[in-house]
């Protein structure tokens, strides 16, 4: 699904989907294009953008700019997740769990693009329900932002990291 992988400055950019949409008016149809993109630094920062324009390149450019403005931080454990996580948005539900070194990214389509630009290299994941790319991207980013490192949990509870990990 990811059609473009460009190293622009310090960000990895991926184009997930381009769609032609139409508006029906008295004189006929007006066609425009939508683009869904994800941007990340490959080290725990990721964002997505959705752009719409009369031409494909303009839609992609708008989506990339929105993605750069809409970035969130993710607490990674090396190149995998801290713990198994679930996320949902609308009808899409995603489940991701950390994997051992050498596993790779076991994910489909839109979820794979988000994980790649976020810097996750080893993960097992599954998407349930709707596989609409926009909802899957939102669900994946929601899940990643809900993930907490042991240090964060320890700070919230007022305990040491060793006590949290057992």
Swiss-Prot record:
Recorded hits in InterPro entries, A to Z, give:
Ribosomal_Su5_D2-typ_SF, Ribosomal_uS5, Ribosomal_uS5_bac-type, Ribosomal_uS5_C, Ribosomal_uS5_N, Ribosomal_uS5_N_CS, Ribsml_uS5_D2-typ_fold_subgr
> What is one GO cellular-component annotation here?
small ribosomal subunit
What is a single molecular function from GO for this protein?
structural constituent of ribosome
Domain annotation S5 DRBM: ranges:
11-74
| PROSITE patterns assigned | RIBOSOMAL_S5, S5_DSRBD
User: Which UniProt keywords are listed?
Assistant: Ribonucleoprotein, Ribosomal protein, RNA-binding, rRNA-binding
Per the record's keyword annotation, is Ion transport included, yes or no? no
Superkingdom, taxonomy of origin: Bacteria
- Gene Ontology biological-process entries: translation
Q: Which Gene3D superfamilies match?
A: 3.30.160.20, 3.30.230.10
Q: Which family does it belong to?
A: Belongs to the universal ribosomal protein uS5 family.
Tell me the domain comment.
Answer: The N-terminal domain interacts with the head of the 30S subunit; the C-terminal domain interacts with the body and contacts protein S4. The interaction surface between S4 and S5 is involved in control of translational fidelity.
- Subunit-structure text: Part of the 30S ribosomal subunit. Contacts proteins S4 and S8.
Q: What does this protein do?
A: With S4 and S12 plays an important role in translational accuracy. Located at the back of the 30S subunit body where it stabilizes the conformation of the head with respect to the body.
Listed name of the protein: Small ribosomal subunit protein uS5
Lineage start = Bacteria, Pseudomonadati, Pseudomonadota, Gammaproteobacteria, Alteromonadales
Give the encoding gene's name.
Answer: rpsE
